Amino acid sequence: MTAARTSAAKSRPRSRRGEGESLRDDLLAATERLMIETGSADAVSIRAIADAVGVTPPSIYLHFPDKNSLILAVCERHFEEFDAVVEAAGKSTHDPVESLRRRGRAYVRFGLENPEPYRILFMTRAEGARQYDILAGAGGRAFQHLVDAVQRCIDAGAFRPADPVFAATGVWTAVHGVTSLLISLPGFPWPDVDAIVDHVCEIQIRGLSQTFDEPEEPS
């Protein structure tokens, strides 16, 4: 261990009884900050997190068994907040199509009002088992709520019969595309943001509402 790291590790006094939760929060905050700075969960190391908080790596393992658990905890916390915001918007009306439209608006608004958490959830690279764990956990619940919203539109006859998972994936990619562009290119001369979001949502809704003729068999 270098002298600098030794100094950093000693800079945080030993937690008193009952202060472990404070250290846990500090670890999550440092992990989140490093993920944003590096743009990749893979680039964040236990050593870097320990140095940022001013503790030794073994102190981290008292709260999290490995780096993957830290990354998941950060993502789950933001996914829960994100899901609550979008769900509240969707439940503000009984009309299933308007509910889906409001979910789309809330999705984009969350990203614009919380760009750094949004980057962590949807714009940092996560691969392999970690990505599966995140999507199957809190992220999976958020996506299932979108699938359910699409299914309600189908059940009401507003959308043509379709695979709700496939349809929801299309809606997600559309609103994510708008959100990520707005976050990544703030200097671009965008037209009215609300109008853009409504336009994209309307394209998705109309596409799912239309009945397409079956293509003719080639002669």
Please place each PLM-identified region on the residue numbering.
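N-terminal intrinsically disordered/low-complexity leader segments
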Residues: 1-22, 212-219
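Amphipathic, non-transmembrane alpha-helical scaffold segments
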Residues: 20, 24, 71, 75, ...
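Generic hydrophobic, amphipathic alpha-helix propensity
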Residues: 23-32, 49, 74-78, 82, ...
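Helix-turn-helix
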Residues: 26, 37-69, 73
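Short amphipathic alpha-helical elements of helix-turn-helix/winged-helix folds
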Residues: 30-37, 110
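Amphipathic alpha-helical linker/stalk segments
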Residues: 77-100, 131-140, 151
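Hydrophobic alpha-helical connector segments
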Residues: 87-117, 168-171
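Hydrophobic/aromatic-rich alpha-helical bundle segments in the mid-to-C-terminal region
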Residues: 129-136, 140, 154-202, 211-219
